[in-house]
A protein has these predicted regions:
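A membrane-topology feature that recognizes alpha-helical transmembrane segments
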Residues: 1-162
Length: 162
């Protein structure tokens, strides 16, 4: 039993490393690779299975969480087609949904939305200041045209799980 608990703890550490990777990759390259979402999903499934084994419970919860991930992808498709979120963001959110109970998932989605909106406001202010300064000074800085939503997703996850 101690071994299972220790393994679950290591899976949470792995999730923290994956979230830090998501922040870096999304900030630096504006991309969240498929391997990252896949590792988040697999570690979440492993964590859930181990938790269910410890509790001697049925594995219905896994099916419900996988269904939730699928429904999140379907619900986010219109946002993707309108350019509101990138595919990597949607896949990461869906993969992370396996980690959350339903109440936690609602909190995660709310926090991620609020943090993402705050990031968007910061980028708007940055671009506005850049525009104002470009009238006075020659600047080689370019405007930021996308929001690295992986930061908001990772921070929302950390606030809920850790």
């Amino acid at each position: 039993m101690l071994t299972i608990t220790l393994f679950i703890t290591w899976l949470y550490y792995l999730l923290a490393v994956l979230l830090a990777s998501a922040v870096y990759l999304d900030w630096r390259y504006r991309q969240l690779p498929n391997w990252l979402s896949l590792l988040v999903l697999l570690s979440g499934v492993a964590t859930l299975l181990l938790q269910q084994a410890l509790a001697s419970a049925s594995y219905d919860e896994l099916g419900l969480r996988m269904l939730t991930a699928l429904l999140l992808i379907l619900a986010a498709l219109p946002v993707y087609y309108l350019g509101g979120l990138a595919a990597g963001d949607i896949k990461l959110i869906a993969a992370l949904s396996v980690w959350f109970e339903f109440e936690q998932l609602k909190t995660f989605l709310l926090l991620t939305t609020l943090i993402g909106g705050f990031l968007a406001l910061i980028i708007i202010c940055y671009n506005f200041c850049l525009t104002l300064l470009s009238f006075r000074y020659q600047s080689n800085k370019t405007k930021i045209t996308t929001v690295p939503y992986g930061i908001a997703i990772s921070l929302g996850t950390a606030l809920v799980l850790f």
